[in-house]
Structures are given as C-alpha cells and as structure tokens.
Regions:
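A short beta-loop-alpha structural element at the N-terminal edge
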Residues: 2-17, 154-172
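Conserved beta-strand in the GNAT
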Residues: 51-53, 60-69, 77-79, 84, ...
C-alpha cells in the first residue's frame, strides 16, 4: 500500500537518495550531489509543504513530486521542480496519484496555474501531462559545451558586479529576445544570488551586454546583448569571462526558446551542441 503525504518533515538527505535512485536511468545524465540539489531547490523556490511524497508500508520514500510556488506571469503559480519514482515501483499509477494530491494541495494554497518542463522525447511523461490537462506553451532547446573546446577571443573589457539591482534589471530585460523559463527567471536568480557570477560590458557608462553563470554547475541562466550592439563580439567577450568564473567543465544553456534564431545561432557559433528539446507546459487550476 502506498501512502501519499507532504515531504515537509522528510530530511533532504532522504529526498536526495530517492531522487538519485529515481533518475538513475533518466534520458539525460544527472550529476546532482546533495549540495547541487539543495541549490537547485532554493533557486527554483521549492516549498516542502506543497510537495508530495509516496511512501511504502515501511515508510520508505519511493516517489516524489517537488513543487515550487511564486508569482509567475501575473499569477500565483506552482512549478514542478522534479518528479520521480524509483524503478521497482513504476507503472503502478504513483506519478498520477502524486499529481492529483499535489493539485488539490496547491489549489487550497490559492495557486492559479501549474507549470512544468518535460523532455519532448519522454513520450510517456508528455502523454501523462496532456491527459491531466496540461497544454504546451513553448518549445525549448538545451545546449551544452565542453569548456576545453572553446577558444577565447575577447574584444571588449568585461566587468564583474556583485549583484544585479532592480534598476539594472529594468535595463537588462530590454535585451531579451524571449521571456526566460522559470528556472532562469529573475526571481530564480535572485533566490540564489550568491551562487552566480555576473559579467557586463559597458560602452560610455551604459551596459550593452551581460551574462550570468552558476559558479559550481556551469549553468548560464541568462546572457544577452543590446540589439543595437550585436555582431561586434560583445557576447563572445562576456561568454569568455563567464567561463573563467565556473568550476564546471561542461557549460550548459537550458531552455532557449526554439523561436529565438539569434540565440541559437550565437550558441552554435560558440561551439555549443544542441542536446535536448523540452516542452514548457501549463495547467490552469
């Protein structure tokens, strides 16, 4: 018999152990030691009281649905930061039951919509979410680069700043070609501000480009250049500086909107490979 309950009283170490077990055969290799899991959850706005665990007769955690909650596109929203079931308990309806439990729970909290991302080739998961009423919002592409493959050619002086203030953000968002996904949003960056390095290029005292990288994981949540200054090497100069700021050997840019030809071409010219495609999906509650 499986019991469903929130995970607010479950140690993060136990959640991590089940997380690693559940994703051991995942389509994308997961490099997620405990510290990285904790940072990921902090960045995405994880709320244990809104997250569901599936427990067997021995009270062992065999599945989880970890939710974040924050305002998103003008609505109080929940975001699925990770859903998994260990191999020996799959195909028993546990994921569907966790979702139903979570949906009722977050509705009681006043949540208006449920947001998630799913790998497009994960057909069973895509089918499950569609059956639950989720609709596809956007197509995303993910990119990866071996740091050793990149040849630095900086043309512009790059500065590092300690944090991006609200007034600076108001200028930087003008450079965007698309709205960042949940995990790459301003709120997510601010939630884990000390885990990032921030690089900017200025011309005559005005910022014309910026980039942000996770010091440990090598994840770049945002990089953009003023449309009036593109094609001059500013983006490449920023990227070169970002690579110096991370311990990681693999650099990742996740959830690039498939419609953004400019961003995709920029990454491919830097030497990135496109390795995964995802759907951004949402459900109105």
């Amino acid at each position: 018999m499986i019991i469903y309950n929130t995970v607010e009283n479950i140690a993060i170490e136990k959640i991590h152990s089940t997380f690693i077990d559940a994703f051991s055969d995942y389509q994308v290799k997961m490099d997620l030691p405990l510290l990285k899991l904790q940072q990921m959850l902090k960045r995405r706005g994880y709320v244990a009281a809104a997250s569901i665990g599936a427990f067997n007769d021995d009270a062992f955690l065999v599945g989880f649905l970890l939710n974040a909650i924050r305002p998103w596109n003008g609505k109080l929203s929940a975001y699925d930061t990770g859903t998994g079931v260990i191999n020996s308990y799959r195909n028993n309806g546990i994921t569907s039951n966790m979702f139903l439990s979570a949906k009722e729970l977050i509705k009681e909290m006043g949540v208006e919509q449920y947001v998630l991302e799913v790998i497009q080739s994960n057909t069973p998961a895509v089918s499950l979410y569609k059956k639950q009423g989720f609709e596809i919002l956007r197509d995303f592409e993910c990119f990866i680069l071996d740091k050793n493959r990149f040849k630095a050619m900086p043309k512009y002086k790059v500065q590092n700043i300690k944090i991006i203030t609200e007034s600076i953000w108001l200028e930087l968002i003008k450079f965007w070609d698309f709205m960042p996904s949940w995990q790459n949003s301003i709120d997510s960056i601010n939630a884990a501000a000390d885990t990032f390095k921030y690089s900017i290029v200025s011309i005559e005292g005005t910022i014309v480009g910026y980039g942000i990288i996770d010091i440990i994981t090598g994840d770049i949540p945002q990089i953009a250049v003023d449309k009036n200054h593109r094609g001059n090497g500013i983006g490449k100069s920023i990227f070169t500086d970002l690579l110096k700021s991370t311990e990681a050997d693999s650099i990742k840019v996740l959830n690039v909107d498939s419609k953004s030809t400019a961003m995709k071409n920029f990454l491919l010219k830097l030497g990135f490979d496109q390795n995964v495609k995802q759907y951004e999906m949402s459900l109105k509650l």
